[in-house]
């Protein structure tokens, strides 16, 4: 519902976004569709799961009576969105992302939310975003479809994405993970798509701890079994030091 969406939008620091728009000069030649309206429209695209510019425009037009709650004077046309998507600097949206990440990260820190780990804990995963193969021929994924893959590092403390790496849709998770910036002393939790001995050795070399699901055909030998602490979680069955023996 648009009223629920409006509550989300009202959480955005409008003055911060205005200052970024001024810095990048993105409201020059705005033609009635300023930077704030553009940002809100693209966020609406994600929340409403729109698959075309027409759906964005029609969706906002259907909420004409509530647009003032979004800080928008009028709903944009399809051509307005298309023009500004092509001509408005992507640098604004990049800086906007990092500014909002910092802003909301501070808000969460000030809220006093408890976190049981002293070390930073991250979840690393990827998702496919489909694209039109005819328009984005560089992102061809299959014979008929295009796609890019987003590799996202989610901070468990703030529940916010801290780093996003974009590759072509065919890129392997383990390959792309080498370009994801993980701070030494952190814990990374990931699926078996990231189980790669070279990647794990690299993380180990920079003092990054990892929790990863192993592949079913993993070959290894047991070196030592450690005693479990008295307060070990009941689902922790065994603690072993092992050596990988596969090629």
Where are these regions (language model features)?
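Short glycine-rich loop/turn motifs
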Residues: 147-151
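Polyanion/phosphate-binding surface patch
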Residues: 52-62
């Amino acid at each position: 519902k648009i009223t629920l969406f409006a509550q989300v939008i009202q959480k955005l620091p409008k003055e911060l976004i205005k200052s970024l728009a001024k810095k990048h000069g993105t409201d020059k030649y705005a033609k009635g569709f300023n930077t704030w309206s553009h940002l809100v429209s693209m966020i609406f695209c994600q929340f409403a799961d729109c698959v075309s510019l027409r759906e964005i425009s029609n969706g906002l037009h259907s909420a004409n009576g509530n647009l003032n709650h979004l800080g928008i004077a009028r709903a944009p046309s399809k051509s307005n969105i298309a023009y500004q998507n092509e001509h408005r600097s992507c640098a604004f949206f990049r800086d906007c992302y990092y500014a909002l990440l910092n802003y909301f990260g501070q808000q969460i820190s000030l809220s006093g939310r408890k976190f049981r780990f002293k070390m930073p804990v991250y979840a690393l995963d990827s998702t496919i975003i489909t694209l039109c193969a005819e328009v984005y021929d560089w992102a061809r994924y299959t014979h008929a479809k295009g796609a890019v893959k987003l590799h996202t590092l989610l901070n468990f403390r703030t529940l916010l994405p801290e780093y996003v790496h974009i590759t072509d849709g065919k890129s392997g998770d383990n390959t792309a993970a080498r370009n994801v910036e993980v701070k030494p002393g952190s814990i990374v939790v990931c699926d078996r798509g990231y189980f790669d001995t070279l990647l794990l050795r690299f993380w180990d070399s920079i003092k990054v701890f990892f929790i990863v699901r192993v592949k079913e055909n993993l070959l290894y030998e047991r070196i030592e079994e450690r005693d479990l602490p008295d307060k070990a979680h009941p689902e922790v069955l065994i603690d072993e030091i092992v050596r990988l023996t596969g090629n």
